[in-house]
UniProtKB/Swiss-Prot annotation:
Name of the protein described by the UniProt record: Glutamate racemase
NCBIfam families attached to this UniProt entry: glut_race, PRK00865.1-1
Organism: Proteus mirabilis (strain HI4320)
Domain of life of the source: Bacteria
Keywords: Cell shape, Cell wall biogenesis/degradation, Isomerase, Peptidoglycan synthesis
Disulfide bonding pattern of the chain: none
Gene Ontology molecular functions: glutamate racemase activity
Pfam family, one: Asp_Glu_race
Family membership noted in the UniProt record: Belongs to the aspartate/glutamate racemases family.
Catalytic activity: L-glutamate = D-glutamate
Top enzyme category: isomerase
Binding site residues for substrate: D32, S33, Y64, G65, N97, T98, T210, H211
Species classification: Bacteria, Pseudomonadati, Pseudomonadota, Gammaproteobacteria, Enterobacterales
Amino acid sequence: MAIARQDVNISSPEATTSDAQSTANPTVLVFDSGVGGLSIYREIREKLPDAHYIYVFDNEAFPYGEKPQEFIIERVVRIVSAVAQQHELAAIVIACNTASTVSLPALRAKFTDIPIVGVVPAIKPAAKLTCNGVVGLLATRATVKRPYTHELIERFATECKVHLLGSAELVELAEKKLHGEKVSCDELRRILAPWLKMKEPPDTVVLGCTHFPLLEEELLSVLPDGTRIIDSGGAIARRTAWLVVNQDKIRGSKEISFAYCLKEDEYSELLKPVLADFGFKMLRKLAL
């Protein structure tokens, strides 16, 4: 069996749960194109249990992976703007690797008074943790192809062999698991076959998509013994909590946590019980 997911520190000042509890219901926006961002939200909620959360998923344009960069930037800025016009936000978390790698500069230019946190593949800590010098990045095909990903590898993992594996099927499997469907380990073995067949496979695997931590248990059962699985969820949570707790002005809300979708359809209806399990008792449609 592989080793459980490692909690790596790739962000600055850490916030504790006791610190977070002193904050009076700040509103934190967590955005993703799908439901993978719930894995990030889950980590943040552990640090800020008393915060008010708004989860937004763009089911109208999901998945972002194959969309043009210009489309993603314009789309994300529009969606975040629509939420910010209606709610006073203490922090914005872009819980999507694809959106983070292209839209953060535009968002930070527009929302200069709201801290914004993005998600990037944890290449740097993986390069430090590996014992055999072989790192695997498991991500969407788009993240695997993006120049930003290769820049991270060139900056932080030049002394390692980094094997990239892009899969849209894993995203679909994670979504199905959230709906209560059993994940086939045989299917995972087929997807991971390029690594499993190697004489020296990665001993450290980076989960480069926020959907993939939802499959952690199944991935651990399929990967070789001793494999470390890491992602940036814990670091993102610590960074978000620190930014919220250390604000001069607390942006508070008395609302219950809820979710926004961009399109009301059968898919969004099926997600309602899933979202409720995560603490989002209400699902609304966001008008752009």
